[in-house]
């Protein structure tokens, strides 16, 4: 991180997610400087112009411009949103081969600038590409973060809030594991106002359990539904990225479900995967190890094994 002065965020990739993220940063007044970098220079120029025209309405002054990888040298945070998009019918893991080569070029270019900050990865499959960013950058793993299951957890809390007619900010529940088809809900640790969700429904019988299972399925499959309807997801993840950015730049020590490196916790090693972690200006201060029940532990192991299988194929030497 820079000593003194304002903070700088470099956004690599100004497609739907990158431009929505920059918009969220400006609207919330999170960053002092935002530099937009894209292979399509005109797109980055256009986004910078468009965002600058709204500065008069922003809560805080923000310096926004289009730039190149040299601008990453003084960045506190580089957020990678570039890569091939998920198409209808594709899983996130289908994008691996398309995006690893792209990431090698991006990360090597960022590091060549003299960058000494943190990486935040948004591109799918995010757990795999966060691992790739760590490998290609040579940075300590706590300084490389993926968006993980932050959006899945937000979707989960939103739908549970609707079901129980409670503000989603008062629903405490996590989705962990792969940001994708093998993710899992941690029902054993889910509560509203300190009351376990399982206890809230125990008098309602099998129907309530089935309704909660449908809520999880809708969380897991939300991206497929949105992509089928509008071609891409970007607003929700942009706000999730802004939340992680705020935790970093404001040194919040906030607990967020990000893609973090495991080195023994949850019984797993050498994998980036979605888990609750404490986030501050140094990156991941620590990973929170939830107490999972037996079924959740087996499910999590399956999710980690799925990611490790992809990593083994992608990084075989």
From Swiss-Prot:
GO MF, any single term: L-lactate dehydrogenase activity
Main location: cytoplasm
TM helices/strands, residue ranges: none
Domain of life from the UniProt record: Bacteria
Entry-annotated residues carrying Phosphotyrosine: 224
Cell compartments where the protein resides: Cytoplasm
Disulfide bonds: none
Record field: catalytic activity: (S)-lactate + NAD(+) = pyruvate + NADH + H(+)
Binding site for substrate: 86, 92, 124-127, 152-155, 233
Known EC number: 1.1.1.27
GO biological process: glycolytic process; lactate metabolic process
A GO cellular component entry from the record: cytoplasm
Keyword Oxidoreductase: yes
Pathway the protein acts in: Fermentation; pyruvate fermentation to lactate; (S)-lactate from pyruvate: step 1/1
Keywords: Allosteric enzyme, Cytoplasm, NAD, Oxidoreductase, Phosphoprotein
Activity control note: Allosterically activated by fructose 1,6-bisphosphate (FBP).
InterPro entries to which the protein is assigned, alphabetical: L-lactate/malate_DH (IPR001557), L-lactate_DH (IPR011304), L-lactate_DH_AS (IPR018177), Lactate/malate_DH_C (IPR022383), Lactate/malate_DH_N (IPR001236), Lactate_DH/Glyco_Ohase_4_C (IPR015955), NAD(P)-bd_dom_sf (IPR036291)
Enzyme class: oxidoreductase
Active site annotation, chain numbering: 179 (proton acceptor)
Functional note: Catalyzes the conversion of lactate to pyruvate.
Family of the protein in this entry: Belongs to the LDH/MDH superfamily. LDH family.
Subunit structure: Homotetramer.
Entry-linked PANTHER family: L-2-HYDROXYCARBOXYLATE DEHYDROGENASE (NAD(P)(+)) (PTHR43128), L-LACTATE DEHYDROGENASE (PTHR43128:SF16)
Name the UniProt record assigns to this protein: L-lactate dehydrogenase
């Amino acid at each position: 991180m820079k000593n003194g002065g304002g903070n700088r965020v470099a956004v690599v990739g100004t497609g739907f997610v990158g431009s929505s993220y920059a918009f969220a940063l400006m609207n919330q007044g999170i960053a002092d400087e935002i530099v937009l970098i894209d292979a399509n220079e005109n797109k980055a120029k256009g986004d910078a112009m468009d965002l600058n025209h709204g500065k008069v309405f922003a809560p805080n002054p923000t310096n926004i411009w289009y730039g190149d990888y040299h601008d990453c040298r003084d960045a506190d945070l580089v957020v990678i949103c570039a890569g091939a998009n998920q198409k209808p019918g594709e899983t996130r893991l289908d994008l691996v081969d398309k995006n690893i080569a792209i990431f090698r070029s991006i990360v090597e270019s960022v590091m060549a600038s003299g960058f000494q900050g943190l990486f935040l990865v948004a591109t799918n499959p995010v757990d795999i590409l966060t691992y790739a960013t760590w490998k290609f950058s040579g940075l300590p793993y706590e300084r490389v973060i993926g968006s993980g299951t932050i959006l899945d957890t937000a979707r989960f809390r939103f739908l549970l809030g609707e079901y129980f007619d409670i503000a989603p900010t008062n629903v405490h529940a996590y989705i962990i594991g792969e940001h994708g088809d093998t993710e899992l809900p941690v029902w054993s640790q889910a509560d509203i106002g300190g009351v376990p969700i399982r206890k809230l429904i125990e008098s309602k019988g099998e129907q309530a359990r089935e309704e909660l299972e449908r809520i999880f399925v809708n969380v897991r499959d939300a991206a497929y539904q949105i992509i089928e309807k509008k071609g891409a997801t970007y607003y929700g993840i942009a706000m999730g990225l802004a939340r992680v950015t705020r935790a970093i730049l404001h040194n919040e020590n906030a607990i967020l479900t990000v893609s973090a490196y495991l080195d023994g916790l949850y019984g797993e090693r050498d994998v980036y995967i979605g888990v609750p972690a404490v986030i501050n200006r140094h990156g991941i201060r620590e990973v929170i190890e939830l107490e999972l029940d037996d079924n959740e532990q087996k499910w999590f192991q399956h999710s980690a094994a799925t990611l490790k299988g992809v990593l083994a194929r992608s990084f075989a030497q």
